[in-house]
C-alpha cells in the first residue's frame, strides 16, 4: 500500500516491559481508536535481541557507581528493528527527566510527524553515544524520576492520540479541552440538581447557551487567575477575556 496511510498516528515503543503498554492500548478512547486502526502502537523489547544465554539487557557503567545502564547491543538492535518499519520521517523521542517538558502544545505538535519511536529507559538510563546518534528529542513529563520511561511514553501516546482526528467522538471533542485554549477547566456539574445540600449554578439550568458559554469562560479565567496566573502571561487574550479579567481583578482583588 504505497503512500496510503493506514493509521492517523503511529507509535513505536522500545521497552523492556511491553505488557505495560496495554494500559493505554486496551482501554478507553485510545483503545477503541487502536481497534479502529486510526492509531497504531507497536512495541520492541531489547530482551528479544539479547545474544547471550542469560538474555542480558543491562550493563555496568564506566566510572563505577551504583546502578546499571541499558546494554547497548540489544537496545540498538531493538531500535533498528523499530526504525525499519516506522513511517519515513518518524522521530525518535527519549523519555527522561533531562528532556523538554511535555505540554499540550508539544502533544499537538507531535501530530504533525509521521510517527514517534518512544525510547523507554530503565535502570539509570542509556549510553550517551546512543542518545547523540539516534535520539531526535528528549521529552519529560516533569521534574520527577520514574523507574522507567514507560509511564511517560503512555502519557504521550494518550495525550497525542486523543488530539488525532476521529479519535474522540464529537461529544468528547478535544477543542473544548481546557488546555486546548490554554486555560484551566471550568467547574462541571451533573445530576442530581441538589447534592450534599448544594445546588447546581442556576445559569447551567437556564438553557441560555450564550450565558452558559460566558459563565464557563469567566470560571476558567477566574480559576486560571487564582491557580496558574503564569498561564495567562504567555497567552494572548481576546477582547472579551481581557474585559472579564479586568472585572475579576477589580471584583476579586486578585
Ligand atoms: N520525568 C520523566 O518524564 C521521566 C522519564 C523517565 C524516567 N525514568 C527512566 C529514566 C531514568 C533515568 C534516565 C532516563 C530515563 N523518569 C522520569
Curated annotation (Swiss-Prot):
Alphabetical GO biological process terms: tRNA N1-guanine methylation
Gene Ontology MF term list: tRNA (guanine(37)-N1)-methyltransferase activity
Keywords: Cytoplasm, Methyltransferase, S-adenosyl-L-methionine, Transferase, tRNA processing
GO cellular component: cytosol
Enzyme class: transferase
Catalytic activity of the protein: guanosine(37) in tRNA + S-adenosyl-L-methionine = N(1)-methylguanosine(37) in tRNA + S-adenosyl-L-homocysteine + H(+)
InterPro entries from the UniProt entry: Alpha/beta_knot_MTases (IPR029028), tRNA_m1G_MeTrfase_C_sf (IPR023148), tRNA_m1G_MeTrfase_TrmD (IPR002649), tRNA_m1G_MTases_N (IPR029026), tRNA_MeTrfase_TRMD/TRM10 (IPR016009)
The EC number(s) this enzyme carries: 2.1.1.228
Compartments it resides in: Cytoplasm
Keyword Cytoplasm (UniProt): yes
Pfam families registered for this protein in UniProt: tRNA_m1G_MT
Top-level taxon: Bacteria
Subunit and interaction comment: Homodimer.
Family membership: Belongs to the RNA methyltransferase TrmD family.
Name of the protein: tRNA (guanine-N(1)-)-methyltransferase
Classification lineage: Bacteria, Pseudomonadati, Pseudomonadota, Gammaproteobacteria, Oceanospirillales
